């Protein structure tokens, strides 16, 4: 139904959309969703992809700073820990849960939640429904741009003043099931003290393994429960450094 590709609103699936924005020269922001519109993909005026971590931070900054909303922030384990830094800045409670929006929705139904978000682009906010809505998130970002009179890039720079500049990248390793299982066992047994030059400082294991390095960068490894795929996530101060972490991880994991 999607010409043979997964309908995930990420940059590799949205190349024609990015090209359209670049070629037009007069598009301030581009909004994309998946097939049922619960996940959001966002582009700036230069056709550069804005990932879900940045969208979550933008939404929190707008809802608290401009709309004076309150409430807890609940995010999936794969979301950047910089969200915690923003929550501390605004005095908000912060909770990390397992991956899967059902873990967020349950809390939204029973507690006062400002925002719930996933790395996949599924985000819900207060005042709407306790479920992901990519179109509503995009409209909220556009409202932020209109009311502030600022570009998306300018608003992202305001976020960076609070949490610092960062880039996030993800790679999927398609492996034989037995190889995937062996890597998972190594993670369970704490067999990775470093990934190439990146020395592990601490590990979090809420849903998968998130390895933090001494400079604050991190790598997350999580096996898919439905297919022979290992998902690797990395965050650093530049795109190049994030990709370097992913490359070092792949080399270490495959031995």
Residues of each region from the PLM?
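Phosphate-binding chemistry for phosphorylated carbohydrates and sugar-nucleotides
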Residues: 1-148, 161
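Catalytic-core signal marking the mid-to-C-terminal active-site face
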Residues: 150-255
């Amino acid at each position: 139904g999607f010409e043979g590709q997964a309908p995930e609103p990420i940059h590799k699936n949205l190349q024609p959309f990015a090209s359209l924005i670049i070629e037009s020269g007069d598009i301030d922001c581009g909004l994309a969703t998946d097939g049922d519109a619960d996940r959001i993909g966002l582009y700036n005026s230069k056709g550069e992809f804005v990932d879900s971590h940045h969208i979550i931070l933008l939404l929190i900054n707008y809802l608290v700073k401009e709309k004076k909303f309150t409430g807890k922030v609940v995010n999936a384990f794969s979301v950047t820990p910089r969200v915690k830094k923003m929550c501390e800045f605004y005095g908000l409670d912060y909770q990390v849960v397992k991956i899967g929006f059902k873990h967020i929705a349950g809390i939204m139904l029973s507690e006062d939640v400002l925002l719930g978000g996933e790395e996949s682009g599924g985000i819900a906010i207060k005042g709407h429904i306790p479920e992901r809505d990519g179109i509503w998130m995009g409209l909220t970002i556009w409202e932020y741009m209109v009311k502030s009179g600022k570009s998306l890039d300018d608003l992202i720079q305001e976020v960076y003043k609070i949490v610092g500049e960062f880039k996030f990248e993800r790679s999927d390793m398609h492996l034989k099931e037995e190889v995937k299982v062996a890597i998972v066992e190594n993670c369970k047994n704490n067999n990775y003290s470093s990934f190439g030059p990146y020395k592990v400082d601490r590990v979090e294991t809420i849903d998968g393994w998130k390895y933090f390095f001494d400079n604050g960068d991190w790598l997350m490894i999580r096996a898919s429960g439905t297919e022979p795929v290992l998902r690797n996530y990395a965050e650093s101060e530049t795109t190049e450094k994030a990709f370097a972490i992913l490359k070092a991880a792949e080399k270490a994991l495959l031995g």
